[in-house]
Amino acid sequence: MESVRSLVEDKPVVIFSKSSCCMSHSIQTLISGFGAKMTVYELDQFSNGQEIEKALVQMGCKPSVPAVFIGQQFIGGANQVMTLQVKNQLAAMLRRAGAIWV
């Protein structure tokens, strides 16, 4: 889990993804639609991607991708992010994290 913490440190939005995952792509599209500054880690392109994926599962992210962190806080996967959007809470959370300025 330390490897995950070091990757999300000092970044407003981090998405752990796999390049072949359509839900990961959808969440990236949603968040980038706000003009948010985000960092995306494609786990299938990392040499230690499986290790990071195991750490994400230990943190409670099932399925392991997408795993979204906003303001260094673990938000969850696609369902949790979409729920925030439906409740009109996602934009405010992105603002508080410094990912968007509006």
UniProtKB/Swiss-Prot annotation:
PANTHER family: GLUTAREDOXIN
GO CC annotation terms, alphabetical: cytoplasm
Principal localisation: cytoplasm
Gene Ontology molecular function: any one: metal ion binding
Name recorded for this polypeptide: Monothiol glutaredoxin-S6
CDD domains named among the record's database cross-references: GRX_GRXh_1_2_like
Functional note: May only reduce GSH-thiol disulfides, but not protein disulfides.
Swiss-Prot/TrEMBL keywords: 2Fe-2S, Cytoplasm, Iron, Iron-sulfur, Metal-binding, Redox-active center
A GO BP entry: negative regulation of transcription by RNA polymerase II
